[in-house]
Structure formats: C-alpha cells, structure tokens
Amino acid sequence: MATILVVEDTPANRALATKLLRAAGHEVLSASTATRGIALARERLPDLVLMDLGLPDVDGWQALSEIRSDGGAVAELRVVAFTAHAMVGDRDRALAAGFDDYLSKPIDYATFADTVEDLLP
C-alpha cells in the first residue's frame, strides 16, 4: 500500500480520485489548496503526489517549483500533473517543467490506474 497525496480544489474530482486510489488499496491524503498540499508533502513524504495545475492560491506549476527547490527527500517526490489542461502540448509542457507524468481530466480509469502504479516505488 502506498501513500498518495491528491491536491485538487474541485470536491468532485478530489472525491473521485480518492475513491479510485482507496479501491486500489492506497492510503490517500488530500488538500484543496497548493499551500496545504505542499505542507502535507513536507510532513508526510507521500509516495506520489497528484497535483492539479489550476489551484486557487498557488498554481500547480509554482507548487511543483517549491517542492523541487526544497532539496532532499521532498525534492525527489514523484509529482503528476493532474489537470483539465488537455490541449496539444500541455503534456510536453508539464514534463518539461519537471512533473513526472501527466493525467488529464476527465479521468480515464485505466490510464489513471496505470499511471499511478507505474510511478509507485
């Protein structure tokens, strides 16, 4: 069982991701803001972080930058862009920015499960 942090401001998306992850046997932490998500990442060092890009306080791009600049174990966390940004080039932009992978919404269940499992230690 892995610990996965879901940072998502939309309650329905956060609930769905949580449900899918728990059904797969994972412990789920959740945050509705980047600030809280970063704090949880630092405190708990989850095995994986699913980070929405369009968060209300700090966007996911800046949140990733803060995580990567922490150094040590926090900087090494696996972080997936989890976003409704699904235009041509968005995936490449996310990977170039340092995300470990990219999941678009609405969620494709098989892709979601495969991506999560591929990134877990």
Predicted region positions:
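Short amphipathic alpha-helix used as the core "switch/output" element in two-component signaling
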Residues: 39, 61-75
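C-terminal output helix
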Residues: 107-116
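Acidic catalytic/metal-coordinating carboxylates
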Residues: 12, 33-36, 59-65
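Two-component/phosphorelay signaling modules centered on CheY-like receiver
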Residues: 11-29
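Conserved acidic carboxylate
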Residues: 8
